[in-house]
Amino acid sequence: MSHTEPKAPVNTGEVENGHLYDGSGTEDDPFIVEFQKDDPGNPMNWGQSRKWFIAAIATLSVFAVTFTSSAYSVSANEVFKDFDISTEVFIVGLSLFVLGFAIGPAVWANIGLRSELYGRQILWIITHIAMVAFLGGSAGSQNVATLLILRFFAGTFGGSPLVNSGGTIADLFPPAQRGLALTIYCVAPFLGPILGPIVGGFVSESVGWRWVQGVCVIFIGVVGILGIVFIPETYGPVLLQRRTHQLAKADGKIYVSVLEKNQGKKLPSEVFKRALFRPWIFLFLEPIVLIASVYMAIIYGTVYMFMGAMPIVYNEDRGWSVGIGGLAFLGIAVGIIFGLVYAIWDNNVRYMKLFAAKSANPESRLPPAIVGGVALPIGMFAFAWTNYPSIHWSVSIILSAPFGFGCVLVILPIMNYLIDTYTIYAASVLAAAAIFRSVVGAVFPLFTTQMYHNLGIHWASSIPAFLTLLCMPFPLIMYRYGEAVRMKCKYSFEAAEMMRKMQLQQTAAATTTEKDKDSSSE
């Protein structure tokens, strides 16, 4: 007669009574707490409408933050009058906000606000309150130093939704279902900076630059309140940890979460050390991560370069007003939307067929990036060389659309490629890419004005076009030789081996379960 381990009944109100946990409830053999099948405490088992509503709020937060970063860029003339500053000093206000996107996560690691330890909900509450406070203060600034410092701190806290919202979506949807949600989420950081100047231009022209900041405060504040009210904690490890505490308090026995059992209890110092140093290890020691990050950073930097370039091209050279000048971004915005539609179509028609046939590998993500890699320089060169007074203004705006189209089709597949390649290390890899592109996005606007005034519109716009042209072969090369390269890189090889072992374990477990069913039926 085989010995059967005692199991703990679940009675927390989060899962149905009758579900059982393995273990004995002792120090040597604690009950192992994990999500059960159809467990309502697992965010992945929530209703589709609820999950999509939460995902929409999380994505809207990313859009609001990036919208705020660029809406400021069209207020130059009014800020000049109020503070008597140069163009270069004004642009620092844009750059510092974007630089905060890179610095923010490192700061939180030091002060202990990490979602791995405390969950995502507390980060949402603290960072949105802080953004509203700092942006509200910047709207009332009486000198330029206060304006710049407060925008930097607003950007520092604004970096939280850029990282945390993607994690929230991953908490809600299993990999096979999260493609559409992540596609829309990944477009928000590019659509926000493009639409910010359009709205900001008309607000600045009508009621002044302080109300541009005020509108952003209201926008972020409303989104923050929506999140506080409607987004509960979604991070699985934290939810399981809370459940272990509830169960232990209820009956006095020993419970540990399945992750703590498998990985050990994480000390805050260990989490902080990993958060601070691991992204840099991947960035500088993994060629795939470095090249992909450089490519994405050039695109991201070019998006923010346009914040300084568009006023020169259309306001200075063509004499447009601040409000009308913001409409020049519509061409790129339309391109981004078309890129989103293409990405969704490609995922549903091509990639999901490969996934269903179990023939998808990380390189299967890259064909759209090959198309986008061609569209990027076409859009940039077309924008650069159709901006003559003799050519109608609509031509350059329309021809900037391929750049927006290419942004989505390069960034999204490359991010998915990095996730599929590094799997267990994906969070650190994406953090490395995000930090690098945020730094580049902060630097590009600093030299935009001088570059356009010294080189002229055509050659200044051609420089990022040449950079994207140099990067164009990367998706094609990785599509052809990516598997061989991955096997030669330390961490991508480790990730592949780990996933292979996990799949073997799952197969073995499934086989054992089938045998047990057959035995019991006999």
UniProtKB/Swiss-Prot annotation:
Alphabetized InterPro entries for the sequence: MFS (IPR011701), MFS_dom (IPR020846), MFS_trans_sf (IPR036259)
Gene Ontology, cellular component aspect: plasma membrane
Entry annotated with the keyword Transmembrane helix: yes
SUPFAM superfamilies for the chain: MFS general substrate transporter (SSF103473)
Region (Disordered): 1-21
A single MF term (Gene Ontology): transmembrane transporter activity
Membrane topology field: Multi-pass membrane protein
Pfam families, per the entry: MFS_1
Main localization of the protein described in the UniProt heading: membrane
Superkingdom of origin: Eukaryota
Loss of function: phenotype: The production of sorbicillinoids shifts mostly towards tetrahydrobisvertinolon.
CDD domains: MFS_Tpo1_MDR_like
Location in the cell: Membrane
Keywords linked to the UniProt accession: Membrane, Transmembrane, Transmembrane helix, Transport
Transmembrane segments annotated in the record for this chain: 52-72, 89-109, 121-141, 143-163, 183-203, 211-231, 280-300, 324-344, 366-386, 395-415, 427-447, 457-477
Keyword Glycoprotein: no
PANTHER family: MAJOR FACILITATOR SUPERFAMILY (PTHR23502), MULTIDRUG TRANSPORTER, PUTATIVE (AFU_ORTHOLOGUE AFUA_3G01890)-RELATED (PTHR23502:SF158)
Family: Belongs to the major facilitator superfamily. Sugar transporter (TC 2.A.1.1) family.
Function field: Major facilitator-type transporter; part of the gene cluster that mediates the biosynthesis of sorbicillinoids, a diverse group of yellow secondary metabolites that restrict growth of competing pathogenic fungi but not of bacteria.
UniProt protein name: Major facilitator-type transporter sorT
Lineage, opening ranks: Eukaryota, Fungi, Dikarya, Ascomycota, Pezizomycotina
Gene assigned in the entry: sorT
